[in-house]
């Protein structure tokens, strides 16, 4: 086995920007060229030539979430969507959705990532670069089981979850429980995902079947990449079931 050791240049944090169709720009900190896009438009993501998953795929999930919430605020004109709301970011956590939420009126933001390195090198610096007060933020890292402890019984108005389903299907029950425990009664969760993944057995179909079986949430598709993509990107909305 040959182990590939990351170079300093490949992990060094640099200042980046992601511009949105509305004209808004999210400033963030990440590795150079980690995000394949610096502008998000309606045609994202890049058309697939094959089904192989690379390191850019997680960022496509971030881009689609940012595109979706920007569309909600500036196209659907729900300008008060984040006003006074508590926001939780989980999944592939970068801080970009949280920054957008805070700059659009969120009262507080929380982030839980599985990677301590990304938390310290990229997520915290992203919050600092955008002058988000520490008193308004709560961050942690750890396993998906530790995410439940991080919630501590708190309910959030909005959960933003890029690439939420990029995991083994065996973890879906716990993911569902985190959403169930963490989302307020009248809250909304937006998650992005691929329809399926090359390296894990989790899939959108399996998760939606779980949601239907548990009957805690109603799932609505908010956005989809073209059907010509071999593996589509999608954004789904979850809200509490009324019955």
UniProtKB/Swiss-Prot annotation:
SUPFAM superfamilies, alphabetized: S-adenosyl-L-methionine-dependent methyltransferases
A Gene Ontology biological process term: epigenetic regulation of gene expression
Residue ranges of coiled coil: none
A GO cellular component entry from the record: cytoplasm
Gene3D superfamilies in alphabetical order: Vaccinia Virus protein VP39
Alphabetized GO MF terms: histone H3R17 methyltransferase activity
InterPro entries linked to this entry: SAM-dependent_MTases_sf
The protein's name in its UniProt record: Uncharacterized protein F22B7.9
UniProt source species: Caenorhabditis elegans
């Amino acid at each position: 086995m040959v182990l590939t050791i990351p170079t300093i240049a490949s992990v060094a944090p640099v200042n980046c920007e992601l511009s949105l169709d509305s004209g808004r720009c999210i400033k963030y900190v990440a590795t150079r060229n980690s995000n394949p896009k610096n502008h998000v438009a309606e045609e994202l993501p890049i058309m697939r030539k094959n089904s192989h998953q690379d390191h850019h795929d997680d960022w496509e999930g971030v881009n689609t979430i940012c595109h979706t919430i920007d569309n909600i605020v500036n196209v659907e004109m729900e300008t008060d969507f984040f006003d006074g709301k508590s926001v939780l970011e989980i999944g592939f956590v970068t801080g970009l959705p949280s920054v957008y939420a805070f700059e659009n009126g969120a009262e507080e933001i929380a982030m839980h990532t599985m990677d301590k390195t990304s938390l310290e090198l990229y997520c915290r610096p992203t919050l600092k670069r955008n002058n988000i007060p520490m008193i308004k933020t709560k961050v942690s890292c750890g396993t998906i089981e530790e995410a439940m402890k991080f919630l501590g019984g708190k309910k959030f108005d909005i959960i933003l979850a890029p690439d939420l389903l990029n995991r083994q299907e065996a973890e879906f029950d716990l993911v569902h429980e985190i959403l169930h425990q963490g989302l307020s009664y009248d809250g909304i969760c937006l998650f992005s995902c691929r329809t399926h993944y090359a390296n894990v057995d989790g899939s959108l179909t399996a998760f939606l079947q779980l949601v239907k079986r548990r009957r805690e949430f109603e799932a609505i598709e908010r956005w989809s990449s073209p059907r010509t993509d071999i593996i589509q990107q999608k954004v789904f909305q979850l809200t509490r079931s009324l019955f």
